[in-house]
Amino acid sequence: DLCAYFDCPLLLGRVQGLLEDGEDLVQAKEWIKDCVRQVARHAGETGVPIAYEPINRFEMNYNHTTKEMVAYIQEINAPLSHKVGLLMDVYHMAMEDNSIAAAFVRSIPYIVHVHFRDSNNGVPGSGTIDFADAVKVLDAMEYKGWIALEVAFDFCDYEKGARDSMAYLAPMIAAAQQCR
């Protein structure tokens, strides 16, 4: 209901849980599917988009790649009229997907929300992730949703982080738009 009030998507990340050794993955995935379906039904009544985030293998123990998460989302969505989509986080994609650009292209119909965070948990341009391909693909697909800058709390002050991020990303955005 808060998402409807603020006109923003509901973001699901770690909601899938971290399984302990010996826990039944198949059963856990069924429970999570049931929970997400219940949330999706309510979100459908309020018009709230849902974005489910694949998380890297160091933080979660299943649904790491965008390909795995798309398959899981397809299972979740099968009986639903209000569909669940993807939250694409380049930080996790850089660890789990062979190509960030290919993962974006493969997932276009499902993308609801995007996170830009560099490999060191800092602002784009402070680590090793090349954001240029992501910017090009998002521009080519005419993505109109939010791109959130996700930065670790202790990395920098937020105003400086926002300025540094835009200084780094603005030339890529301009170059991508010139290629249209």
Which residues make up each language-model segment?
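Active-site acidic/histidine proton-transfer and metal-coordination neighborhood
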Residues: 1-85, 95, 179-180
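Histidine-acidic metal/acid-base catalytic patches
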Residues: 37, 63-88, 92-180
